[in-house]
């Protein structure tokens, strides 16, 4: 474990420190497109123990204040602030919150960092404000914040359909991942609008299925436009002992799956000069799973 997946309560009434774990898409199929332009997907989300850390402090004046703004992102557009204000408005609570974010998950890499931060904000403030909201209530708010937010609120590894809102829990075998971070920023909108994108992959029937059946339909489009992603992925695919290698989301991050920590760390020690990466363990469920009742 990376040690950051800890949840602490200070004075149990006024402060919370909570992780926001990253996710991997073990496969991602584009199976159609709605009339409104949204793409219909099938994917398996795997939570991993590499995480941002968020700290929340109770405020009696109702103000939501982010003390660690992201450069270039107006505070009112920050996903943590939007999540806090949405929950505050929908619940009618008079409480506010101070929010501090320790960012570790690379931005724009397909690891779901911003979405995970938003979900952790919903789950943590549900606890801090003593709202007692059930998970299905929080899940109704999640799509307003982003397509990947629901799975983090769902708090389990999941098979997802639709635009990511139809979620079924899925049991996945223990695994460790070597995750590489190519030095490029992939435009998700550009990838989904590409004429080269396959949008008619035959849907997988569940159950049963195996992640080995899958692939990432976005991968060929991204690799053609971003050679660095292709180079990193090609290196992963020649590793001995890797059960699979793929791109997560719309990139740019790519990963290889191993059965053991030693296998993943051995591969990390072999990465070529100029490549960067880290090892993460697959989780069975979100560390804040119990912050909302089923």
UniProtKB/Swiss-Prot annotation:
EC identifiers of the protein: 2.7.1.148
Pfam family name, one: GHMP_kinases_C
Molecular function GO labels: 4-(cytidine 5'-diphospho)-2-C-methyl-D-erythritol kinase activity; ATP binding
Gene3D superfamilies listed in its UniProt record: 3.30.230.10, GHMP kinase, C-terminal domain
Pathway: Isoprenoid biosynthesis; isopentenyl diphosphate biosynthesis via DXP pathway; isopentenyl diphosphate from 1-deoxy-D-xylulose 5-phosphate: step 3/6
Binding site for ATP: 106-116
Signal sequence bounds: none
Its job: Catalyzes the phosphorylation of the position 2 hydroxy group of 4-diphosphocytidyl-2C-methyl-D-erythritol.
Family: Belongs to the GHMP kinase family. IspE subfamily.
The protein's name in its UniProt record: 4-diphosphocytidyl-2-C-methyl-D-erythritol kinase
Organism: Nitrosospira multiformis (strain ATCC 25196 / NCIMB 11849 / C 71)
